Amino acid sequence: DLCIFMDESHHYHADKSFDVINELRPIMGVELTATPQIQKGSRKIPFKNVVYEYSLAHALNDEKYVKVPVVFTRKDFRPEEYTPEQLDHEKLNDGLRLHEDTKSRLEVYARTFGRPVVKPFVLVVARDTDHSKEIMKYIKSNDFFNGYYADKVMEINSAQRGAEKDENIEQLLSLENPDNKIEVVIHVNMLKEGWDVTNIYTIVPLRASASETLTEQTIGRGLRLPYGERTGVDEVDRLSIVSHDKY
């Protein structure tokens, strides 16, 4: 008898996927997902036969297991007065200022309470590969914090191959290590799931999210707590998200 456990099971709901699974003739299928819904265009179709659900809303209400997501914007901000490139630059500047403040707060907390120092990093969501390269160029330039992040930024996308891809994967897997110098990760729809780190503290979305599922997956990257529980210090327990008008 065969029982199939399907992680990230929202991927299995296409007709061809079901055909393959049914050919195996399992007696039971158990699905695991943080986003129990199928997005079809603008429609969101919830899963049926849900045995147990623990939603982000429940986790936030329990005030124990995840960071508190907080959206940061500017008062009286008029995006129509900026070009798309200028808007990206403003959001990146706001995001990195939040990052520097968070980095200081984490260090103060660790030294005050004798805990390991957590090295935070920023996740930047780009529209496509060309956009990602433009962001990378800007962050490495002297126009961005006088070039401070030139050797502290990495880009991950599906076009990377060979040694470059291997090096980036190695960097991603060691981002929680204080010796890893990377503080900014730019990605194009590559890290929405299956990548678990606890030290994402700032997310800068520079693309409109295509679906509610994608939004939840992206934010979900940053909700894990580095100390395994909330500390009671707002800045240590917070995930900062720089506002996007369509995110």
What are these regions (language model features)?
Residues 48-138, 142-159:
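Conserved interdomain linker/interface between the two RecA-like ATPase lobes of SF2 helicase motors
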Residues 7-8, 190:
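Walker B catalytic acidic pair
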Residues 25-28, 62-68, 150-151, 198-201, ...:
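Short glycine-/polar-rich loops that comprise or flank the Walker A/P-loop
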Residues 159-247:
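Conserved RecA-like P-loop NTPase helicase motor core
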Residues 9-19, 195-198:
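Conserved ATPase-coupling elements of RecA-like P-loop NTPase cores
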Residues 14-68:
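Post-DEXD/H (motif II) to motif III coupling segment of the RecA-like Helicase ATP-binding lobe
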Residues 1:
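Inter-Walker segment of RecA-like/P-loop motor cores
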